[in-house]
């Protein structure tokens, strides 16, 4: 007779819980940002590129961008396809190494990001209203702490994108 599986341990799985809330959050933010033709992942890519170029960088190497976003490069490339097709990002030459593929945000991408920010803010406010501001703040702190610990402290705790 086969030994039964104790599912009580599975119900406490941190990964499954995180994936469940991630799906719910993604649906909420995608619903808001979809009104301007973006997903939350695409919004994050545009925001990170915008931040880098405001900081003086003309472009960001794709590998570095994937690291900053906590994404695998193949996942990032999948998210980049529609952004490229819409002319929101463009391929660039890395100034320090011409062999490195890099990206820049276009003027059209900056305009779309500006248009998207109020929709993102609305989704953020709905989340804070549903959870309560204190719980939302504690959740963000816990998530920042988990990212830092799991990456060995490599990522800044205040770098949400």
Model-inferred region functions:
Residues 21, 25, 32, 69, ...:
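Alpha-helical linker/hinge and terminal dimerization helices associated
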Residues 1-6, 56-57, 133-161:
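C-terminal regulatory/oligomerization modules of transcriptional regulators
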Residues 15, 68, 102:
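Short aromatic/hydrophobic contact patches that present stacked aromatics
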């Amino acid at each position: 007779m086969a030994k039964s599986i104790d599912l009580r341990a599975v119900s406490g799985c941190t990964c499954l819980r995180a994936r469940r809330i991630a799906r719910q959050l993604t649906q909420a933010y995608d619903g808001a940002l979809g009104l301007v033709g973006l997903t939350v992942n695409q919004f994050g890519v545009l925001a990170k590129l915008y931040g880098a170029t405001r900081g003086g960088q003309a472009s960001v190497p794709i590998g570095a961008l994937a690291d900053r976003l906590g994404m695998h490069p193949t996942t990032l490339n999948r998210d980049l396809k529609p952004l490229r097709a819409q002319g929101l990002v463009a391929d660039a030459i890395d100034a320090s190494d011409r062999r490195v593929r890099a990206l820049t945000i276009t003027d059209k991408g900056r305009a779309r990001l500006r248009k998207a920010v109020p929709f993102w803010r609305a989704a953020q406010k709905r989340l804070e209203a549903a959870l309560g501001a204190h719980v939302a703040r504690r959740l963000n702190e816990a998530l920042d702490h988990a990212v830092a610990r799991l990456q060995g402290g490599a990522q800044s705790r205040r770098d949400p994108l």
